[in-house]
């Protein structure tokens, strides 16, 4: 059975800060950076401090109890790791396009939904991307994450096919890519 050019893994865990610290320990010689995020303001920062990013991502969790009267349960951090095993390298615009597709189809950040979940896409290795999100939306409700792993795999398959990563020629015609902007550095703390 052939391997897919974009390998993806979806999991839910308890701690956003711990996950971000774990992901920061990436490939030696590669400087991790924030590719994009739910907030254009955050994505425009030159340097992102990991504890600050974790606090911002988790803010809807902290506001959930006062809004809804319910305490949030465990495993509220959503993590999607995507690795490119194809011989074709993906640039930031490609990763940006794939990120937008993944957060849209999974229900993490549907296009045009102002109360969607908070998420961030981090480039931690030259051939991969990690998307981190909280599953509580801005309005305090749970995100509708039904079959999210399947949706991510489907988005990766479609992207790989459309860009010729699966051995087939890329689909030609009108192509629109959103600007991802320059690489932005990530640091563990402000000190």
Task: Locate predicted features.
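N-terminal nicking endonuclease/strand-transfer module with a His-rich metal-binding environment
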Residues: 1-191
């Amino acid at each position: 059975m052939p391997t897919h050019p974009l390998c993806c893994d979806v999991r839910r865990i308890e701690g956003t800060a711990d996950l971000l610290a774990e992901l920061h320990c990436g490939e030696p010689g590669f400087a991790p950076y924030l590719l994009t995020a739910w907030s254009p303001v955050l994505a425009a920062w030159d340097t992102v401090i990991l504890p600050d990013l974790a606090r911002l991502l988790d803010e809807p969790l902290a506001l959930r109890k006062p809004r809804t009267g319910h305490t949030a349960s465990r495993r509220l951090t959503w993590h999607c790791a995507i690795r490119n095993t194809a011989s074709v390298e993906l640039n930031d615009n490609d990763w940006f396009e794939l990120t937008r597709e993944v957060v849209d189809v999974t229900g993490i950040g549907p296009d045009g939904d102002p109360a969607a979940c908070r998420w961030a896409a981090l480039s931690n290795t030259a051939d991969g991307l990690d998307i981190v999100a909280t599953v509580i939306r801005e309005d305090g409700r749970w995100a509708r994450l039904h079959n999210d792993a399947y949706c991510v795999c489907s988005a990766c398959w479609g992207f790989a096919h459309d860009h010729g990563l699966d051995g087939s020629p890329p689909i030609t015609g009108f192509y629109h890519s959103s600007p991802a902007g320059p690489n932005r550095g990530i640091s563990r703390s402000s000190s």
